């Protein structure tokens, strides 16, 4: 599920909305599975990390907890300030313009943020700061809402904005096509990133990461999370309130909670 344009790095003002409520973003956005963190640490030659687009530190803290030294690079000063308050060292800059000042690192990671980075310029920057055999790891949480919850979103949107058009996203294919569906999602998310990595000539062939996990949301947890996903940015305050109230009532009718099947997907590449 995504609200991103094909080349979001060319329209970065879209990302500025997220810093308006950094505390909500940090509280409500999903984290990442422990298996992902373990895999990335195992692939890295050491524990000196940079987290590109660290935001409030959601992607950084699991690596810190595992004993890594993590430096965040974040373009939004509001998000950076929140992350600092949670114990993360953060430098404020666009990653492409960030000045590493001669420092090198064992791994560069980016969780749900690389789409805001120019894929070629970003990969070149990474190549310049990684130590020999250093790791680049890009990852994101992909998910599809249960059909009843997706329908509730559509109904709530039509209730809040009766004159607007709500387009339902394409449905997940039948179970026997699940593997092909996963490949399509992977390709959509990371084909441009992989192209940028290859064009530098500085990395091994990118390899896929994929970890599946579930999370159950209560009504209140989901209503807290929805505004952090960007899909309501264009609604005024009254329309947003109508949307959330209608959606909350629908979730109550569905039993008050539901489970999302997440797939944390991404790519890794090794510095030659």
List the predicted regions and their residue ranges:
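Conserved Class I S-adenosyl-L-methionine
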Residues: 183-272
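Class I SAM-dependent methyltransferase SAM/SAH-binding core
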Residues: 56-98
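A short SAM/SAH-binding and catalytic strip from SAM-dependent methyltransferases
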Residues: 107-120
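A short acidic, Gly/Pro-enriched loop at the edge of an enzyme's catalytic core
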Residues: 98-108
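A short glycine-rich, Lys/Arg-flanked "PGG" loop and its adjoining helix->strand segment in the class I
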Residues: 121-132
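Conserved catalytic/acceptor-binding region of the Class I
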Residues: 131-212
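Conserved class I S-adenosyl-L-methionine
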Residues: 1-44, 47-53
């Amino acid at each position: 599920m995504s609200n991103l344009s094909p080349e979001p790095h060319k329209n970065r003002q879209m990302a500025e909305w997220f810093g308006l409520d950094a505390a909500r973003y940090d509280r409500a956005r999903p984290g990442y599975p422990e298996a992902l963190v373990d895999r990335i640490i195992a692939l890295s030659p050491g524990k000196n990390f940079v987290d590109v687009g660290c935001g409030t530190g959601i992607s950084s803290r699991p690596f810190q907890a595992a004993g890594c030294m993590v430096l965040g690079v974040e373009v939004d000063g509001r998000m950076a300030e929140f992350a600092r308050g949670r114990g993360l060292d953060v430098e404020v800059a666009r990653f492409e313009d960030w000045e590493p000042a001669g420092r090198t690192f064992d791994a560069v990671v980016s969780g749900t943020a690389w789409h805001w980075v120019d894929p070629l310029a970003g990969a070149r920057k990474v190549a310049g700061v990684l130590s020999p055999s250093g790791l680049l790891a890009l990852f994101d949480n992909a998910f599809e809402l249960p059909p009843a919850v997706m329908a509730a979103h559509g109904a709530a949107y039509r209730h809040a904005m009766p004159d607007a058009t709500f387009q339902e996203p394409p449905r997940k294919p039948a179970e026997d096509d699940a593997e092909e569906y996963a490949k399509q999602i992977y390709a959509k998310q990371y084909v441009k990133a992989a192209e940028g990595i290859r064009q530098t000539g500085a990395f091994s062939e990118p390899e896929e990461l994929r970890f599946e996990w579930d999370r159950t949301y209560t009504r209140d947890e989901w209503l807290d999370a929805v505004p952090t996903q960007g899909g309501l940015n264009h609604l005024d305050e009254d329309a947003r309130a109508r949307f959330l109230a209608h959606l909350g009532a629908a979730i109550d009718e569905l039993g008050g909670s539901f489970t999302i099947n997440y797939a944390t997907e991404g790519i890794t590449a090794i510095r030659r």
